[in-house]
Amino acid sequence: SPLHHDERGYFVENWRKMDLLQYGVPELFFQGKLQNNVSVSKKGTIRGMHCQGWAKLMTVASGTFRMCFIDLRLSSPSYKAVDVIDVVPGMAIFVPAGVSNGAQALTDKGILNYLVTGYYDPNAKHAGIMPLDKTLNLPWDLSGEVIISSKDQKSDSYLSIVKKIESTRKKIAVIGYTGVIGSKVFEQLHSFKQYEVDGFNRDNLSELLQQEYDCVICTAPSSEKFKTNIGLANPVEEIEILVDTIAKVKAMQFVLVSSQTALHSENRYGQVQNEVCQAVLQHHSNHSIYFMDTLYGENLKKGLIHDLLHQ
């Protein structure tokens, strides 16, 4: 917002909802505001790097502040990205929940406003990173006296905070990860940083039982319907191993991508799909099963046409 100067000083519209919405601040933020805080800081003072878990709208009433930000949201495409900006009156900075933030007063008696969605509690224990962390090496102004509270000086290191965050990743296993559907699921899951994804097929399926998973996604057995019906795919031994593994694997949630053929077991392919489906129903109370019709993937790698063309 522009500053309106006169002989008394200046006036500024600190923030306007319609402007902030235009620049990406979510509507929900304005419904959840609980408190406005003001800090007055001596030159050189660093407050941070805080991560209280709530959103903030930060504006400067007087002076200049160097603000540093680290995105600690596992699900964010900018996870672990660092941003630095010198903020003066007339600028508004929206900090999403999960983004660690800190500010250094570059001028004396700097005044900073915080509009927040959480109540202040001096005894609360929130995550924080020591602002002078050597790994981060943030570009604070260290040319003069630097003032940091004892609480902020005792904050965790950047690497220890990252380790804690990444230990919360959900562990997911994809059975059939080299198949047409499985490979796409595996590829997409790998693009999300909040997931730790392992892939299994007939070559390493036994290793699935060595760990516990938050979720197991099964896209097996092979979708080669024609070959299965004439005995050239999905042999009995492989299906027995798959069914046994499904029964024994430890998972909080089990997702099966099956075929509508499982509902009609008059041929071998339907029987195979039904066996796998029954194993899921019997051994995993928290399950989801998706019955899909015959699909044709990239280069016709699925379905009857592919089977006929590649005999």
Where are these regions (language model features)?
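Hydrophobic/small residue at the entry helix of a nucleotide-binding pocket
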Residues: 95, 148, 181
